[in-house]
Design a protein with these regions (language model features):
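Phosphate-centric recognition/catalysis
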Residues: 24
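Rossmann-like S-adenosyl-L-methionine
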Residues: 88-205
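Short secondary-structure junction motifs
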Residues: 1, 55-57, 180
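Short histidine-centered catalytic/ligand-binding loop motif
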Residues: 27-39
Length: 205
């Protein structure tokens, strides 16, 4: 419950609204005008319910930096939602644990809401087939697939992303889990790298 999707749009009868929980931070993305005009009510109720259940929530960060909002006359924006009862929430960074692996999550700059929660079981599957293998993780983002492969016994994992910040985050997450001798983040264009590897007969992958 510390790391999960709390509201999943139409499936939960909130069309255009996604709310993810990452430890002590909620992250919301509002894509419909109908939800936008009611978000203050919804967010405050959600916060109240969680607090009444004894959950520690530092704040709610809005990730509305998506162009689809323009189609409904809404502006792109991101930042902390102002709860009346909460103190200054601080940095939009937190730590989560999934499949026994710890991650730093940047809810301000990470893709989507900061972490791809829907890939949890795919990451588990990777861990089961990675033992002894040399693994190439493309579009690594936070290094989640790479770290699960390493935790599953991979001999070596190269985690590639065009973002230098993503590669650095992967290295930091690997170090946090004692997997830095196995996982290495690499800043590179995946498509260029794959073309090079096709012609590299000595490649390990």
């Amino acid at each position: 419950f510390k790391c999960c999707r709390l509201i999943f749009g139409e499936a939960d009868h909130f069309p255009g609204l996604t709310v993810d929980r990452f430890n002590d931070i909620l992250v919301a993305q509002t894509l419909s005008l109908g939800i936008e005009v009611r978000k203050e009510l919804i967010f405050n109720l959600l916060y109240k319910i969680l607090r009444e259940q004894g959950e520690e929530i530092r704040g709610l960060y809005e990730r509305n930096d998506v162009k689809i909002r323009l189609l409904e006359g809404m502006e792109e924006n991101k930042g902390w939602f102002a709860f009346a009862e909460t103190a200054e929430p601080g940095e939009p960074l937190t730590e989560i644990v999934e499949n026994g692996i710890k991650y730093n999550v940047d809810v301000e700059n990470g893709q989507k809401t900061g972490f791809f929660l829907d890939q949890k079981y795919n990451r588990q599957a990777i861990a089961k087939i990675a033992r002894g293998k040399h693994v190439l993780d493309c579009f690594t983002h936070t290094g989640a697939f790479a770290l699960n492969a390493a935790a599953g016994g991979a001999a070596a994992v190269t985690a590639v992303d065009i973002s230098a910040e993503a590669a650095q985050m992967t290295d930091a997450n690997a170090s946090k889990n004692g997997l830095d001798k196995v996982v290495k983040g690499l800043k590179a264009n995946v498509f260029d790298l794959l073309s090079e590897l096709v012609n590299n007969k000595s490649r390990e992958f």
